[in-house]
Amino acid sequence: MDTIIKPFDKLTTQELFNIYKLRVDVFVVEQQCPYHEVDDIDTISHHIYLQNDNSKILAYCRLYKIEDTFHIGRVIASPKRKGYGTQIMKTAIEFAETTLHVDTIIIEAQTYAQEFYEKLGFIQTSEPFDEDGIEHVRMKYVRKKNNKNNTNHPENKKIIIKAKKYRNLNKINCCLY
């Protein structure tokens, strides 16, 4: 399996076709929601997808910035309940944090998927609303400033630097907790 992250202008025609086909199959056909699936946001997005060895897309989302706000949208996992949705969302969040230095991400989630996003750290920020006949909620993800797993976080760099300065590590135990 491969994870691919590309801006719109770097996608091949085959990649773009595969992305649009999956999105139409899920959002228009499966959800019976006849609306314009292809939009101008595609041209300003990073397209993030997981594909198998046969180039079949298993999960997809797009990450984009409007004004000063980053958004993730068009999240798809197909087939469902295999962990692909979690994997693609974690990849998108990590890419946003480490490469684009994003602290906050907004999504408009279908309400049936709200718990899925909450497990990833998103919190609900709106009352339910209708979008194209489907109930959604707005949600927000805020990067945890003291994320111990983020070695690029400035606080973690300070700890590493302090640890290198001292021969006796007992002197810095208070900094590690």
Predicted regions and their residues:
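Conserved catalytic-core motifs of GNAT/GCN5-like acyltransferases
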Residues: 106, 118, 123-138
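Conserved beta-strand in the GNAT
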Residues: 49, 56-64, 69-76
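Short amphipathic alpha-helix that is part of the acyltransferase structural core
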Residues: 1-42, 47, 52-57, 166
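Conserved acetyl-CoA-binding loop-helix of GNAT-fold acetyltransferases
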Residues: 77, 82-94
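Conserved beta-strand segments that form the floor/walls of ligand-binding pockets within enzyme
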Residues: 71, 76, 106-108, 138-140
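Short acidic/glycine-enriched loop/turn segments that link adjacent beta-strands
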Residues: 42-44, 68, 131-135
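C-terminal "cap" of GNAT-fold acetyltransferases
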Residues: 110, 130-177
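Conserved GNAT acetyl-CoA-binding A-motif
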Residues: 96-110
